[in-house]
Regions:
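N-terminal amphipathic/basic leader segments beginning at the initiator methionine
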Residues: 2-51, 368-376
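Acidic, Ser/Thr/Pro-rich beta/coil linker or hinge segments at domain junctions
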Residues: 13-14, 336-380
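Glycine-rich phosphate/pyrophosphate-binding loop regions near the starts of catalytic domains
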Residues: 34, 42-213, 219, 224, ...
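Active-site-proximal betaalpha loop/short-helix elements
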Residues: 40, 47-48, 142-144, 237-313
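Short Gly/Ser/Thr- and Asp/Glu-enriched loop/turn motifs at secondary-structure junctions
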Residues: 64-65, 311-316
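Helix N-cap motif at beta-to-alpha junctions
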Residues: 321-326
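Short amphipathic alpha-helices in soluble, non-transmembrane regions
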Residues: 328-338
């Protein structure tokens, strides 16, 4: 017998046995997470089966092995029947990223921790030039978390993954005693593929290049702050959380000479621009009036004494493109969902070296330093 056919038969037999055991019905009767759900026994199995496997619903997860195993052809996006036509994988590199999410509250205007956990890792891969393919999901659950809340976040992750075109292929769950956590923490790791033709990095940046952003800044951080209800002000600000991989692919397709990209999450736009300036040894000159900030968000920042350039974002990125390609870049982004407010905000200059300078609305200049402290803790 062909070893490949034998392997397929063995796999089918294992899957049949799993399905037969599951059909006996391992029911999740609890309304709240208990320590038993993290103990590895029947309660754990019921939680995994009835919340995660059924919630994410894909073949790789259903096998419930210690690792999600799938052909490289699937990661590359090639159909299995075309495997023989694929000469090799030498035209690609693999990219991997991981991030943990502890946002408080877990639901906020415009999104939730589940959606954020998928989008954040997808975006980290995308701005590295990778095409995101698969992600993992690790959960730290606090005893007493309503199962209904967990189901909601699992569904939010599934919806976000489908929108981003990625699959959740493996995961883990742990439960900590009440008071040892705060409802729900999530870690995600992702893998993507990078065509070798893409050369993104600070070493590609040149004097005269333009700095662009894909959208308005500071919405996410201020949305979470408002949702906490600790402040005497209220503002209907929605988080910008979204996957930006479609925007990135559009930009790289239209402007393959794009030099560098970053998503401006913790520390905001000001921090990532400082990191770029330090890495290149060049200066960054930006214009205050060119940076898109929604009026409601700017007003909330002003009332709290917070500079929006340091506030976290979860659905926009910053990029450096050649000066003669900036119009093409902006036209491309503005034609795509989520990129309507893309803007040219500045340029790369020789001096001041390794520094960021902002030209204010009044024609003056001020230094934009690295963020000091953490004015907005647990915003992602």
């Amino acid at each position: 017998m062909d070893p490949k056919n034998r392997l397929n038969q063995d796999e089918a037999k294992v899957n049949s046995n799993i399905a037969r055991v599951r059909s006996r019905g391992m029911k999740l009767k609890d309304e709240y997470v208990t320590l038993s759900h993290g103990a590895g026994g029947k309660a754990s199995a019921a939680l995994v089966e009835q919340v995660f496997v059924s919630g994410y619903g894909n073949r790789v997860l259903e096998e419930l092995t210690d690792a999600g195993v799938l052909p490289l052809t699937e990661i590359l996006g090639v159909f299995a029947e075309d495997e023989d036509a694929l000469a090799d994988f030498s035209g690609y590199k693999l990219a991997m990223s991981t991030d943990s999410y502890v946002v408080n509250p877990i639901v906020f205007p415009g999104g939730s921790i589940g959606e954020l956990a998928v989008n954040g890792t997808v975006n980290d891969l995308a701005v590295s030039g990778a095409i995101p393919k698969v992600i993992s999901a690790g959960f730290i659950l606090e005893e007493g978390l309503p199962i209904a809340d967990l189901r909601r976040e699992v569904q939010a992750m599934r919806d976000a993954a489908e929108k981003a075109g990625v699959r959740i292929v493996t995961g883990d769950t742990k439960v900590v005693p009440k008071g040892s956590g705060d409802k729900l923490f999530i870690n995600t790791a992702g893998i993507g593929i990078v065509p070798l033709s893409r050369q993104l990095g600070a070493d590609q940046v040149q004097r005269g290049d333009r700095i662009i952003v894909s959208g308005a800044i500071a919405d996410h951080g201020m949305s979470v702050m408002m949702a906490r209800g600790d402040l005497a002000i209220e503002a209907p600000i929605k988080s910008d959380t979204r996957a930006v991989n479609c925007l990135v692919e559009g930009l790289l397709g239209a402007v393959p000479q794009t030099r560098w990209m970053r998503d401006a999450t913790r520390g905001g736009l000001g921090t990532v621009l400082n990191e770029l300036a330090v890495a290149t040894g060049l200066g960054i000159a930006i214009e205050d009036e060119s940076i898109p900030v929604h009026d409601m968000t700017r007003g909330a920042c002003d009332m709290l004494g917070i500079d929006p350039i340091y506030v976290a974002n979860e659905g926009m990125f910053c990029a450096v493109v050649p000066a003669d390609q900036v119009d093409t870049a902006l036209e491309t982004l503005r034609a795509l969902p989520g990129g309507e407010e893309a803007a040219n905000i500045g340029r790369v200059v020789s001096k001041p070296e390794s520094s960021v300078v902002m030209v204010t609305a009044f024609g003056g200049t001020r230094m934009i330093d690295m963020l000091v402290g953490d004015p907005l803790p647990r915003i992602c």
